[in-house]
Structures are given as C-alpha cells and as structure tokens.
Amino acid sequence: MLRDVLTLSRHVLQQFGSFTAEAQDFSALMNRIALAGKMIARRLSQAGLIEGALGVTGSLNVQGEEQQQMDDYANRAFIRALEQTGLVCRLVSEEMKTPARLPENCSLSRLALMIDPLDGSSNIDANLSVGSIFSVLHPLEDRPEADNQDLLQPGRRQLAAGYILYGPSTQLVYSVGKGVHGFTLDPSLGEFILSRSDIRIPERGSVYSLNEGYFCQWSEGIQNYVRYVHRRDGYISRYSGALVADFHRILLQGGVYLYPGTQKKPEGKLRLMYEANPLAFLAEQAGGAATTGTEAILDIVPQSLHQRVPLIIGSRENVEEVLRCLEGSLVP
C-alpha cells in the first residue's frame, strides 16, 4: 500500500506553519539543496561508466587533502544549484579556502550555506556510501563581513541543518529546529518524499563507531572506552569511513560515533562549521548529544571557518559512557 506523499517543499512550509516570505524562501532553498543532491546522486550512479567520475584530480584541497574527482563535481553542483536563485549570498565549502560569494543573490538574501559537498569520497571507488552535509546560517549583523567574522557563531544559532546520504537509496535528513525528519528520493517522481517523521535517537544503542586503527594515538580515556566495550557483551563495532553513513546508523539505531583527537592532531580531524555543527544540531533535535569530550559542540565559538574539533556524538547514555571513561570514573 502506498504511503501518503508529502514532498520536501511542502514539509518545510508545514514546519513554518505559514506561507510567509521566509517560509517560502526556506522551502525554495531546501529544494535547491535537494537539486544538488539529485545531481550528485545521478553522477554517483554512473561513476563506473563515465570518464572523470572516479579517482583523484591530482590536486589538494584547502585542507591539504587529495581531492577526488567527485569532490570537485559535488562542490560545483551546489554552486550551480544556488546561482541566480536569490536564496544564498555566501557558500562556505570544505573544498574552497574562502567562501564563494554569489553577488547576484546578495541583494535578496544574506543567508550563508555551509557545506561538506561530499563526505567520505574515498569510498566511491569501492562503491560504498557517501554523503553531503549542510548548515544554514544568518550572518551576525553586529560583526564585520571582513574575514567572514559574521559567520563565526556557535552551532546553536544554526537556522537549519541536514545531510544527504547516497546509499542503496538517496535520503535527505534535515531540521529547522522543530525535530528531525527524513526523506527518500523517489526516482520515478524525481522528488524527496517524507519517509521518517520526528526521528528520535534511542537513549542507548549497541553500536560504537570509530577507526580503531588510531588506537595507539588516542588519549588514555578514549583507549579505556575501547577496552571497556571490548570486555563487555552488547556492543557492536560498525565503521564505514563515511561520517554521514555512520551517523545515520547511530541516529536510527542508537549508539555512539567517535572521531577523537590524536597525539599528532589533538584538535581532531572533522570540521566544526560544516560537519560537527550540523550533525550535532540534528543529534540534539533528536534527543541525543554531541561533545568534544570537554564541551558541547553547539556551544563552541568558532575561531575560523575551517576549524577542526574532536567529535563524540550519538545516544545520550552512550555519550555519557564515553565521558565517564575520559574523566576516569568508568574503568575497563
């Protein structure tokens, strides 16, 4: 039996409870983000068949990381989807040192979109899941635009956040601060249709997700957490190497995802503004928690657009378990 068809654009309007200009602009913005997701999903589905979809570009991105062909395509897809729309003035991306300014939009909108256009892109050559992450901000009016100071604001000020997961199906999950909702792309309609409403992360889950290859580089507290779960029944390790895919599992099934700092990189690897903040926003909206190990992710005042942070995110009880290991009150 077919379920009720509620499209993404209609759902956004329902979230605002009105047809105000703000609601319509947000609905249009989510549609353009969804359009970029459809473009990326189509390209990924053809990745083994067309030239220039697999492998690396031969250059490094602003993070000093080897850029995959699909990283570059995904970044351009978001820019193309938002040009000439009047919806977003600035686009901050993992793939660009400075924000892309869309001058034709700035007379109509001051909103900024923060994106990781393609998370986990090293998975593509092996045909594994990847994702896109996004966050919508309103620049602070009392801060100068120079050096993008007006964008450096805590994650609690996000207007909306979400991600698109490219897997067996293409799914979009988002929140405007009124719960977390999931949509599945119906290829026959070309529309994202509501498939999960008011998602709540379980208070506790069995999954822990982290790359244990870095064990020797972690702090004693993180090492003790790994020893703790190894020595007890009821814990399952799942790690794909794609943040969106691993977080999506935690969101639906419960558990905890960890990407802690290491001896070489105590600041962590994940970017605050367009990776940790959006997912932390979703986690808290769904009843979960997100922390660096010392402070809530959403309370951090960013110092730069590409700032990195450690991340511990997931079910409240699981996150608390990690924190107790860090403080030494829970021992293996």
Curated annotation (Swiss-Prot):
Keyword Cytoplasm: yes
Family: Belongs to the FBPase class 1 family.
Localization, UniProt: Cytoplasm
Catalysed reactions listed for this entry: beta-D-fructose 1,6-bisphosphate + H2O = beta-D-fructose 6-phosphate + phosphate
GO MF annotations in UniProt: fructose 1,6-bisphosphate 1-phosphatase activity; magnesium ion binding
Binding site for substrate: D119, G120, S121, S122, N211, Y239, Y257, L258, Y259, K269
Subunit structure: Homotetramer.
Cofactor: binding comment: Binds 2 magnesium ions per subunit.
Protein name (record): Fructose-1,6-bisphosphatase class 1
Record gene name: fbp
Organism phylogeny: Bacteria, Bacillati, Cyanobacteriota, Cyanophyceae, Synechococcales
One term under GO cellular component: cytosol
NCBIfam families: PRK09293.1-1
UniProt binding sites for Mg(2+) 2: D116, D119, E275
